[in-house]
């Protein structure tokens, strides 16, 4: 039965193709001029490329406009190796025991979530002394221990990360304005 249906489908398909190909006039779809079709009939309107063809034409035109601009300024292009070499993270060197300044962006009970500009943020406990001073948006000093807490568990072939950095909270970063105010109050 399946073979019988298949032959009927092929026969219907070939009949459709025969009708579609031989009884429709060729109009040169996708070309700007009708010269490829072999007829130069003035009554026949020019057909525009549609869908993908028109998008490809527009994209090609944009690329042609951009190419002269790119050739004129090769000095602005910097290689990845150069950007990596001059990045602040690479210039910093090993992260262990580096002093950085961060900003508290989230607080959950006594946990302070601090962003210091690294790949991950760090979580530190709120100090018991002057704990009320550590509010959201406060700038704090940190001593980095590790930029990424990772560990390889027993039998694992890859490291598992906690998506956090490890740092010790040293205190609030005093700005120049706050220091000058304290000096004026003491005098």
Curated annotation (Swiss-Prot):
Modified residues (Phosphoserine): 73
GO CC annotation: mitochondrial inner membrane; mitochondrial small ribosomal subunit; mitochondrion
Keywords: Acetylation, Disease variant, Mitochondrion, Phosphoprotein, Primary mitochondrial disease, Ribonucleoprotein, Ribosomal protein, Transit peptide
One GO process term, biological-process aspect: mitochondrial translation
Modified residues (N6-acetyllysine): 133
Stretch forming the transit peptide: 1-71
Superkingdom of this protein's organism: Eukaryota
Location in or out of the cell: Mitochondrion
GO molecular function ontology, one term from the record: RNA binding
Pfam families named among the record's database cross-references: MRP-S35
PANTHER family xref list: MITOCHONDRIAL 28S RIBOSOMAL PROTEIN S28 (PTHR13447), SMALL RIBOSOMAL SUBUNIT PROTEIN BS1M (PTHR13447:SF2)
The family this protein is said to belong to: Belongs to the bacterial ribosomal protein bS1 family.
Binding partners and assembly: Component of the mitochondrial small ribosomal subunit (mt-SSU). Mature mammalian 55S mitochondrial ribosomes consist of a small (28S) and a large (39S) subunit. The 28S small subunit contains a 12S ribosomal RNA (12S mt-rRNA) and 30 different proteins. The 39S large subunit contains a 16S rRNA (16S mt-rRNA), a copy of mitochondrial valine transfer RNA (mt-tRNA(Val)), which plays an integral structural role, and 52 different proteins.
Known disease link: Combined oxidative phosphorylation deficiency 47: An autosomal recessive, multisystemic, mitochondrial disorder characterized by intrauterine growth retardation, swallowing difficulties with failure to thrive, hypoglycemia, dehydration, and hepatomegaly. Additional features include global developmental delay with impaired intellectual development and absent speech, microcephaly, facial dysmorphism, cataract, sensorineural deafness, skeletal features, and cryptorchidism.
Name of the protein in question: Small ribosomal subunit protein bS1m
The species this protein was found in: Homo sapiens (Human)
Lineage of the species this protein comes from: Eukaryota, Metazoa, Chordata, Craniata, Vertebrata
Gene: MRPS28
């Amino acid at each position: 039965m399946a073979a019988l249906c298949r032959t009927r489908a092929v026969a219907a398909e070939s009949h459709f193709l025969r009708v579609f190909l031989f009884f429709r006039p060729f109009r040169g779809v996708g070309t700007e001029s009708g010269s490829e079709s072999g007829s130069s009939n003035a009554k026949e309107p020019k057909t525009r490329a549609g869908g993908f063809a028109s998008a490809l034409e527009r994209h090609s035109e944009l690329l042609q406009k951009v190419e002269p601009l790119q050739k004129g300024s090769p000095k602005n292009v910097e290689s990845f190796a150069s950007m990596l070499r001059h990045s602040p993270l690479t210039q910093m060197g090993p992260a262990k025991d580096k002093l950085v300044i961060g900003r508290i962006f989230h607080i959950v009970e006594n946990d302070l979530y601090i962003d210091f500009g690294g790949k991950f943020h760090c979580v530190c406990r709120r100090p018991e002394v002057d704990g009320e001073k550590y509010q959201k948006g406060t700038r704090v000093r940190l001593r980095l221990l590790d930029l990424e807490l990772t560990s390889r568990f027993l039998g694992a072939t890859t490291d598992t990360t906690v998506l956090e950095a490890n740092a010790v909270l040293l205190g609030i970063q005093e700005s120049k304005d706050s220091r000058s105010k304290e000096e004026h109050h003491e005098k």
